[in-house]
Amino acid sequence: MKPENKIPVLTRLSDEMTAVVNFQQPGLPPWPADGDIETQRQYYLLERRFWNADAPSMTTRTCAVSTPYGDVTTRLYSPQPTSQATLYYLHGGGFILGNLDTHDRIMRLLARYTGCTVIGIDYSLSPQARYPQAIEETVAVCSYFSQHADEYSLNVEEIGFAGDSAGAMLALASALWLRDKHIRCGNVIAILLWYGLYGLQDSVSRRLFGGAWDGLTREDLDMYEKAYLRNDEDRESPWYCLFNNDLTRDVPPCFIASAEFDPLIDDSRLLHQTLQAHQQPCEYKMYPGTLHAFLHYSRMMTIADDALQDGARFFMARMKTPR
């Protein structure tokens, strides 16, 4: 797609989204476009500090979980002494960026709104770790906590997965992995998915949207994919291209959220339409005027907070004893 033919999304954003795009953090240097991956990771962490400030206070605990690939750090957010369910969170960042600190506010808000313990999983990043390592680490973490629930005051009879962007793919892929490999870590009552990618290689939205403002040009998306996958054959794997998995049966209820001007929105639309066509429980919600990654900006965007609360309500409604 010739760049001039793309939709000029910056002229169509909501006032809140425009304010975020135009916001300049004092003293923040420009994005190190030519820097190595570690430099970009450090910049991402620095840039996210502002957006993670003023988050709800609650009890947190860090735990290193042994996996076949080594220890994986997890962080438990406990808004109250006992929890009716456990929600595992996978952060976004194109498989190559992000950690528990870059998504701290999101997880704290989810814990507050659900009243449940949220466990953030600091899975290994690409390209140092490649598919399916992050999924297998997630499964190992779930297995660990299902076996040690009493030590952490967890209720793992009912669990859920949640994630944004690449983390949304990992959340759904991990739930399908548990189903397909017959691994039981608890009853998966819901999966909360914010603007994920689920396996499309091309789409109308990928042609019309994406630019320097969101880091999701076609070249960017290709780079993330090449960093994550081991080889070209992995593109068709049913835990990467999730549309190659069986979505006609036993898919946990999915809350599918999208951003209006996201090049990945067609992934969410197709996922919703596929699940709906096969009577799999799901709910789709598009948030108007937003760009990819808007969930981070709840300090300035009420719609970001709305999106978190919508996901929390979806999760709570599927508990045996809703709050």
Swiss-Prot record:
Motif mapping: Involved in the stabilization of the negatively charged intermediate by the formation of the oxyanion hole: 91-93
GO MF term set: carboxylic ester hydrolase activity
Enzyme class of the recorded protein, top EC level: hydrolase
UniProt entry tagged with the keyword Methyltransferase: no
Keywords recorded for this protein, A-Z: Cytoplasm, Hydrolase, Serine esterase
Residues at the catalytic site: S165, D262, H292
Major subcellular site: cytoplasm
Database matches in Pfam families: Abhydrolase_3 (PF07859)
The protein's Enzyme Commission number: 3.1.1.-
Top-rank taxon, per record: Bacteria
Keyword Zinc-finger: no
Localization annotation: Cytoplasm
GO CC terms of this entry: cytoplasm
Disulfide bonds: none
The family this protein is said to belong to: Belongs to the 'GDXG' lipolytic enzyme family.
HAMAP family according to UniProt: Acetyl_esterase
Protein's job: Displays esterase activity towards short chain fatty esters (acyl chain length of up to 8 carbons). Able to hydrolyze triacetylglycerol (triacetin) and tributyrylglycerol (tributyrin), but not trioleylglycerol (triolein) or cholesterol oleate. Negatively regulates MalT activity by antagonizing maltotriose binding. Inhibits MelA galactosidase activity.
Subunit structure: Homodimer. Interacts with MalT and MelA.
Protein name: Acetyl esterase
Originating organism: Salmonella typhi
